[in-house]
Amino acid sequence: SLFAPSALVLTVGEGESAADSGVQRAVTLTCTPKASGTHPAARAACDQLRAVDGDFKALVTTKSDRVCTKEYRPIVITAEGVWDGHRVSYEHKFANPCMASDGKGVVFEF
């Protein structure tokens, strides 16, 4: 192939960290050579990742104008695989589902 591979497994779960969270949902996302996988919006997710050059830290936001309760029910999102030929291992914790739904972007909407 002329393209470096971009294939990921993405998860969303409840817990303090990926190591102790129960995975609630998981999808596959392949962006090269074309958007595919079990992700429900593969093309939009790939476009969002390309816009930040695969930098998940730039993709995921924690700032929002949305008002969320202060409940602590942590949500953990992960990305494992390869982006543009480089190994990816990313994990981010949100304090609760409200904050997660606001900050995770299209990539983690599944």
From Swiss-Prot:
The record marks 70-71 as: Reactive bond. Its main location: secreted. InterPro entries: Prot_inh_I16_SSI (IPR000691), Prot_inh_SSI_I16_CS (IPR020054), Subtilisin_inhibitor (IPR023549), Subtilisin_inhibitor-like_sf (IPR036819). It comes from Streptomyces netropsis. The keyword Transferase does not apply. GO terms for cellular component: extracellular region. Belongs to the protease inhibitor I16 (SSI) family. SUPFAM superfamilies: Subtilisin inhibitor. It is found in: Secreted. One of its GO terms (molecular function) is serine-type endopeptidase inhibitor activity. Homodimer. Disulfide bonds join 31-46, 68-98. Keywords: Disulfide bond, Protease inhibitor, Secreted, Serine protease inhibitor. It holds the Pfam family SSI. It comes from the Bacteria. This is Protease inhibitor SIL-V1/SIL-V4.
